[in-house]
Amino acid sequence: MSESSVPKTPSGDDSEADLYKSGIYLFMDVVNPDNCKDVIEFILKQNTEKKRKKKLQLMICSPGGDMPSCFALIDVMKGSKIPIHTVGLGLIASCGLLLFIAGEHGYRVLTPNTSILSHQFSWGNWGKEHELFAQVKEFELSTKRMLDHYKKCTGLDEEQIREHLLPPEDVWLSAKEAKKLGI
């Protein structure tokens, strides 16, 4: 578990335990299997409490990271019986942005000094020719997943997404610009 995230089972009266009890998770890290697992466990535990909270809040400052882990967390966020509100802090980039927009529409907040980066994802691979061709299929599936996620969460169509959020070059946005794009 990353030191910057809320503990899975908080102890004592420290501020992290208070956040956990309040239904707030502070995610300030790269997106990877370990820290996504921690957030998934947090959401699942909150959903199985006898007295559920009215909302959960996921505060995100992330440079991005691992797509499969990101989509695992997105699936759990979308399946949560408790609405998840998101807050973008400092930097939400790449997978960090995908997590941010998975928050309930109308309850996504970008702080004024948040930098937002959207871009086509990158990947690398090696292997025999047939293995590389097989990986192309996963690349195509991941691209489709990302486009579908942007469509559902922003209301933009594929052409608008490719033009404004996923062109060949990196796209940096201010909070105001992001809001205009449905982020």
Q: What is each PLM-predicted segment?
A:
Residues 1-183:
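Terminal-region recognition feature
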